[in-house]
């Protein structure tokens, strides 16, 4: 089982973040994820707010094996520029970009002059964008007159050698799951790791795949799982932090939080993570260390480390 790690919520300086990613690579992690578009910043903490795309490419350039990814939000990007940026990253670090995208839902975007349309419009926008991006990556001249994406003979050079870059889409609602069925190589399951909730969303994705004649088994399943390696095995000590860092899951009861978090000794956390990956049929679990300081992040990285590659 390949394993990824996420360092989110702008908890680290560039120097610390690069050290953590170097450590993750040395310990055999398959991928590291960092913060995405800068307007995802919330609150008033004084901290480095590093541009997600710049950091992604900088980390790709300084590492050798590990994949690097960060969240792209559809209304932050022009389709052709995003296709070109991703193709450039692929040229710099072949096969190592984790291209993760979703519709976004951050009120802070308006501070940056970004006026997000409704959720339904953002779904349409993402559909148009990924259709255009796929064509550009194939080396085609793309003309499109969509509601949100308008291109007139756009091309990028160089296109990715394989004519494609794998796409991960994060989502849980039916309309986004239809986009997963249409465009995604990986479904980033944007849910707490609770079997009933994941099963319900999985059934909707399977239905959307059948409607398109696609085998849902073709789509890799990934999930970020809140992980805290610590001396206490009592998950209750992490509930407040879990809810603060995952406000979209704020309605979870304490019992559900206990089931949705991986907390305790390294051995306990490894066992729990393996159990969740098996139960939820995950191909690519990601331990979510968002919000942890550098020392606690290193402890978790070492405690959860997969076997080093030969």
Task: Report each predicted region and the residues it spans.
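Active-site-adjacent structural elements that line small-molecule/cofactor binding pockets in enzymes
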Residues: 1-310
